Amino acid sequence: MYYPEPIARLIESFSKLPGIGQKTATRLAFYTIGMEDQDVNEFAKNLLSAKRDLRFCSICGNLTESDPCAICTDPTRDRTTILVVEESKDVLAMEKIREYRGLYHVLHGTISPMNGISPDEINVKSLITRLMDSEVKEVIIATNATSDGEATAMYLARMIKPAGIKVTRLAHGLAVGSDIEYADEVTLSKAVENRLEI
């Protein structure tokens, strides 16, 4: 189907977003065109601001406006526990349940032999360094229940256990192949409560 070039480019831009197919991208493009100029400008400004103003925390790797992030600098957090997640969105999901009061570490991905992603290509080295220089007694591995998530969890357990640090894994309620981001708060709460040592 033919669209004027500005619409075609907008559709193409929307279709690059995860989970957005051609049909949804087209719908979003036409919706955006119908928006008031002020709303479009605010949307564009917010996109640019998020891209420009956010950075990764130098301690945990979470997205933040200030470095170190608010979680790492919060004196009320339990500094003896670190919960390891794949992405920053997983930190948000865990914070929603309000059960976990420790620190986090964001890997920015998983080990994936099939995709050629090795431990050196995710945020593992800084975790190991962090563990050697801290009072951490337990690392909770909260990678997704996928083959890559499991491979990453096993690798991390092998790296961390020799240091005498307890390594646990989220438990009950997370189906194999599921993403933490999409789990409901009760399921996540139970998974943290019933974590298993690995």
Swiss-Prot record:
GO molecular function, a single term: zinc ion binding
SUPFAM superfamilies (alphabetical): Recombination protein RecR
Keywords in alphabetical order: DNA damage, DNA recombination, DNA repair, Metal-binding, Zinc, Zinc-finger
Membrane-spanning parts: none
NCBIfam families: recR (TIGR00615)
Family statement: Belongs to the RecR family.
Protein name as catalogued: Recombination protein RecR
